[in-house]
């Protein structure tokens, strides 16, 4: 069987950026990772209906910046910023007042081509007993109309209440999963039904990143440029 790597992790540092950006002493790493996971769980629990694409967390000393990418920023900000202030207070309480927390909200301009938002939408429809085939086909159609070059959606579990779990998928366009320069977005969601849980996976190909050099860290570029000079001097 072919072994499949996570599409996001495969491209970290190439076409994708880390969603947790901080440096910590060795003994603090487990604590920071658990805190990040609790923050993401809190946000998705309260604002999952707002079309959350991703939650990025930055730390510097005792300061923390939480960046939320969402399709409906107004639902998180609230009237006169009331909701976002309540969320900030909950995060501060979760962290036991150890951090000065700031929250930044960014709008996802094209949610039809955001894999996490698409998979969440399909999962919610399955929970409302909408036909999974209909939900998948509609999502594929919207994504292709919105500029995606390829899309694959897979669902697995007791589909339609069947006794035996199975896996089904639909594919349209091209999906170069093994090419590092290809911009492939990936999302995963779980639909909770009375028959059990159904997993929803979504891959969306948005085209190639033309200039990879701009995405590489400066230090790596400097080392790459100096290497031929060392050989020449030798």
Curated annotation (Swiss-Prot):
Recorded superkingdom: Bacteria
CDD domains membership: KH-II_30S_S3
Domain KH type-2: 39-109
Alphabetical list of Pfam families matching this protein: KH_2, Ribosomal_S3_C
Alphabetically ordered keywords of this record: Ribonucleoprotein, Ribosomal protein, RNA-binding, rRNA-binding
Subunit note: Part of the 30S ribosomal subunit. Forms a tight complex with proteins S10 and S14.
Function: Binds the lower part of the 30S subunit head. Binds mRNA in the 70S ribosome, positioning it for translation.
Protein name as annotated: Small ribosomal subunit protein uS3
């Amino acid at each position: 069987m072919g072994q499949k790597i996570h599409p996001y992790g495969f491209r970290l540092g190439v076409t994708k950026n880390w969603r947790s950006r901080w440096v910590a002493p060795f003994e603090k790493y487990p604590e920071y990772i658990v805190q990040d996971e609790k923050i993401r769980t809190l946000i998705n629990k309260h604002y999952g209906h707002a079309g959350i694409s991703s939650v990025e967390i930055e730390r510097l000393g005792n300061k923390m910046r939480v960046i939320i990418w969402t399709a409906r920023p107004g639902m998180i900000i609230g009237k006169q910023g009331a909701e976002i202030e309540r969320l900030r207070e909950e995060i501060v309480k979760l962290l036991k007042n150890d951090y000065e927390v700031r929250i930044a909200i960014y709008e996802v301009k094209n949610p039809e081509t955001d894999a996490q938002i698409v998979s969440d939408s399909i999962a919610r429809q399955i929970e409302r007993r909408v036909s999974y085939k209909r939900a998948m086909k509609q999502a594929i159609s919207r994504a292709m109309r919105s500029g995606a070059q390829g899309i694959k959606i897979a669902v697995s579990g007791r589909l339609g209440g069947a006794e035996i779990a199975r896996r089904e998928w639909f594919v349209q366009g091209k999906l170069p999963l093994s090419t590092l320069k290809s911009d492939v977005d990936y999302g995963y969601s779980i639909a909770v039904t009375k028959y059990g849980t159904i997993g929803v996976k979504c891959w969306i190909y948005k085209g190639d990143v033309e200039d990879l050099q701009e995405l590489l860290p400066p230090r790596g570029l400097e080392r790459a440029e100096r290497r031929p000079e060392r050989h020449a001097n030798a």
